[in-house]
C-alpha cells in the first residue's frame, strides 16, 4: 500500500514545506512508495481526503500540518474502515 501524504505547506508559519522536504528525504532513502498532495486553500485538505478515499481499495493517509490540517483530512475521509490515518 502506497502512503498518501496531504501536506499543508503553510503550516508552522510557512515551515510546512521544509518539514515535508525532510520527510521526503527519509522516504526516498528508505525506498518507500508515496504520493504527495499539497493543500492550496482552507478546506482543500477535506477535498483531497474525500477524493482519495472515494477511490477503491485501502488507503494509508498521512496528514502533515497542524491541528487544522488534521481536522480537515479527518472530515474528508469517506470510507473509514478502509483507511489508516497518520
Give residue ranges: language-model regions.
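Small-residue-rich beta-alpha loop regions that form the catalytic core of phosphotransfer
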Residues: 2-86
Amino acid at each position: 500500500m502506497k502512503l498518501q501524504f496531504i501536506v499543508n505547506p503553510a503550516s508552522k508559519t510557512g515551515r510546512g514545506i521544509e518539514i515535508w522536504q525532510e520527510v521526503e528525504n527519509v522516504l526516498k532513502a528508505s525506498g518507500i512508495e508515496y504520493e504527495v498532495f499539497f493543500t492550496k486553500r482552507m478546506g482543500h485538505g477535506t477535498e483531497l481526503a474525500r477524493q482519495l478515499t472515494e477511490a477503491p481499495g485501502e488507503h494509508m493517509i498521512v496528514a502533515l500540518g497542524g491541528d487544522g490540517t488534521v481536522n480537515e483530512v479527518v472530515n474528508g475521509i469517506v470510507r473509514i474502515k478502509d483507511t489508516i490515518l497518520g
